[in-house]
Amino acid sequence: MRRRFATVVVLVASLGLLLSGCSADAPEPSATAPADAGAVRNDLQYGTASGEKLLLNACLPEGAKGATAAVILIHGGGFDSGTKDFGGMTALCAELADGGIAAFSVDYRLAPKYAYPAQVNDVTAALEWLREPAQVAEFGIDPERIGLFGSSAGAIIASSIGTKGSGSLNGGDRVAAVVALSPAVDLTESGLLLGDPSKVAIASILQYLGCDDFTECPNARDASALYAVDKTDPPFYIAMSKNELVPLAQGQAMALALKSVGVPVILDVKAGKRHALELLDEATRASIRQFLIEELVTASTRTD
């Protein structure tokens, strides 16, 4: 059963502007949103880990009527670089808000100083923080309609949280939808047989796992979203290209696993070698717009 929200018509119309102009080769955006955008609040602390402050940027819709859907943005950077302002995330944050969805671009601890599960724990902490009554009231968000949008390394983190979440959408660590651009979902030694991963990708994953090689890497399976798939997982939108940094076989395996347990999934495959935010051409933006409308704006709350 689906329930409709008072804001649906407004959000569907305004989401026509969502994600426009977010190519990965665009100049690094400034941390300041356009003057006509909704409120932007930078460097909000959502937690502390290992003595370090964990920060996020909030981009809030202007003139929202009622509680809005929200998306947590998770940057890429090979796990050892990047920030909440990195790789087009600032622009994407503002554009989501302009389309009527609250967006929160998060920092997380980086490798090699911190290995898995530090990154997953940090983003999960941001999710749980946003669901606290104080933040729900302050940001005007619906805690049951929070999704994740991850790019590259961020897509690995998003996929992990999406498949491992438990509890209710009100107060647990489950999410309502996942957008994953170029995710690697099987980080085990056998997972390397899926396609032909580049040396750069392998090095980044090993650093994330805190391992020197895959033969003795106890974190590898636990960090692999593929092995955590079950019927309670949220709908996934997976975008990849045929010859990119992450083998297409990784995305295909994830899509097959999700479909096998009845979880809605879109696998959007592009030609060429585009990776992560480079995938955001007009067709992909339009498809993601529709996905977010269906899964965060107009969808009913899941009870399984």
Residue ranges and their predicted role:
Residues 10-15:
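Hydrophobic helical h-region of N-terminal Sec-dependent signal peptides
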